[in-house]
């Protein structure tokens, strides 16, 4: 199934049952966990990473402009080429999302969360995708691509939740 606008949720939409009623409870729970992780980790400085600014500098402006979306997807039954097509669909949605030009065009991010992907399989899963994806085309379009396969630890976070997300952001 291709990426669809109806699969995109702003962080504040996750608390609105009328906006998320089509999602399985497990998907809602996973998206809420990633939203919490974004608000409490990704947008803040982290001394262990050696930078004074946020973990990802593209996320705070996207949050401020309400152009950061989460999408719940399933990995089951999908091959690496299927995932490449899916992510390409989200790439097109991101590039087409307003605004498409001007200074604010770079303040957009999409986090694709593979809600059924066990953390133990995430690295191999994303390695297979990386071997097939056209990273050059992402760079040419001014996009950053970050499959979160690194350990993310904090007071309430483990790799169990966050090794299965995939982040696209617009940057220049």
Model-inferred region functions:
Residues 1-104:
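N-terminal, charge-rich interaction modules
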Residues 104-111, 116-168:
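Non-transmembrane, aqueous-exposed alpha-helical and coiled segments at domain scale
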């Amino acid at each position: 199934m291709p990426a669809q606008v109806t699969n995109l949720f702003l962080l504040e939409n996750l608390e609105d049952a009328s906006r998320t009623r089509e999602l399985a409870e497990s998907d809602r729970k996973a998206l809420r966990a990633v939203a919490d992780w974004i608000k409490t980790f990704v947008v803040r400085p982290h001394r262990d990473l050696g930078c004074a600014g946020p973990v990802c500098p593209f996320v705070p402006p996207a949050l401020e402009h309400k152009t950061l979306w989460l999408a719940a997807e399933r990995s089951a039954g999908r091959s690496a080429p299927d995932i490449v097509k899916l992510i390409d669909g989200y790439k097109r949605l991101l590039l087409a999302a307003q605004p498409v030009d001007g200074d604010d065009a770079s303040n957009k991010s999409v986090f694709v969360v593979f809600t059924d992907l066990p953390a133990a399989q995430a690295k191999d899963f994303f390695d297979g995708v990386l071997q097939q994806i056209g990273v050059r085309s992402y760079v040419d379009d001014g996009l950053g691509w970050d499959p979160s396969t690194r350990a993310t630890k904090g007071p309430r976070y483990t790799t169990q939740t966050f090794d299965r997300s995939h982040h696209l952001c617009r940057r220049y």
